[in-house]
Amino acid sequence: MATKVVLDFEKPLFELEAKLDEMRQCLRNSTREQSPSETEMLNHDIETLELKVDALRRSIYKNLTRWQKVQLARHPARPYTLDYIHLMTRDFLELAGDRRYSDDKAIIGGFARIEESATGFSQPVMIIGHQKGRDTKSNLYRNFGMAQPEGYRKALRLMQLAEKFRKPVITLIDTPGAFPGIEAEERGTAEAIARNLYEMAKLTVPVICVIIGEGASGGAIGIGVGDRILMAENSWYSVISPESCSSILWRSWKYKEQAAEALQLTAVDLLSQGIIDRIIPEPVGGAHTDPDVMAATLKEILIEELKALLPKDPATLVHERIEKFSSMGVWNEEE
């Protein structure tokens, strides 16, 4: 059985839940010698503690700091791209390789079908995303979700294939950044990401980008140019991680909380700044507490966005996408 990961700010809740489990176990193990009044009292105590646990849970997750949301975005049990693909789509056909160098396992992609049974909506899509591992072995295989140049070139190849067959593109972003190794730099990481930005802006099919966990720097935006930019409630998206920002500004990682506040990297921050278009609500406690519900919510929103984008003609899609990204940010011009 996997060990439950408890974040620092979750410890008071974890302790109360452990106490509640003990009381429930005590009730299950109670013998017939226990009087009805004692059983009733224990039931009452359990109900009281359940209310306290629920209130504490809602209080904690309603008032998360930016750094705490970064921690939730990195939770090892959080659903990854493959989890969402399996929960949201059917008939997934993975496609491999960049046709230049190799197949980067940190980015996966392929054709799939997303459906809505209530309305009969059924749409083939190209779905592409970063993929992390669940343990040391799989993380080494996936390079901890840090894509190399061939990963971004593979992603672009799949997007252009989708364009050829007139299928919309969905990207799922979850990376601590592009791989910073010397070999990756020699193979052209910067060029690969820049080429993706240029080509994604011109794709003549709908493109929806979703930050499902970490969205760090060029590694994230390398598959992040779209008609709609969505963010999971407890994800983050920034030019730099809080730890790296702290090490640059204060020469130490211990100021990561202050860095997270200064970076304004949460979904709420970015929605208010016009960087993203929509926040995807998560179950209380984070996406990992109920992946099925999280995937169902994301699927519903994706279908809604697809229905809005599919009727648009290619020229309109490209024009609006370029205008969208051109209008981001604030700057001053000299008179």
UniProtKB/Swiss-Prot annotation:
Its EC number is 2.1.3.15. Keywords: ATP-binding, Cytoplasm, Fatty acid biosynthesis, Fatty acid metabolism, Lipid biosynthesis, Lipid metabolism, Nucleotide-binding, Transferase. GO terms for molecular function: acetyl-CoA carboxylase activity; ATP binding; carboxyl- or carbamoyltransferase activity. The keyword Nucleotide-binding applies. It comes from the Bacteria. One of its GO terms (biological process) is fatty acid biosynthetic process. Its main location: cytoplasm. It catalyses: N(6)-carboxybiotinyl-L-lysyl-[protein] + acetyl-CoA = N(6)-biotinyl-L-lysyl-[protein] + malonyl-CoA. Residues 48-308 form the CoA carboxyltransferase C-terminal domain. It is an enzyme of class 2 (transferase). GO terms for cellular component: acetyl-CoA carboxylase complex. InterPro entries: Acetyl_CoA_COase_a_su, ClpP/crotonase-like_dom_sf, COA_CT_C. Pathway: Lipid metabolism; malonyl-CoA biosynthesis; malonyl-CoA from acetyl-CoA: step 1/1. It is found in: Cytoplasm. PROSITE patterns: COA_CT_CTER. The keyword NAD does not apply. Belongs to the AccA family. Component of the acetyl coenzyme A carboxylase (ACC) complex. First, biotin carboxylase catalyzes the carboxylation of biotin on its carrier protein (BCCP) and then the CO(2) group is transferred by the carboxyltransferase to acetyl-CoA to form malonyl-CoA. Acetyl-CoA carboxylase is a heterohexamer composed of biotin carboxyl carrier protein (AccB), biotin carboxylase (AccC) and two subunits each of ACCase subunit alpha (AccA) and ACCase subunit beta (AccD). This is Acetyl-coenzyme A carboxylase carboxyl transferase subunit alpha.
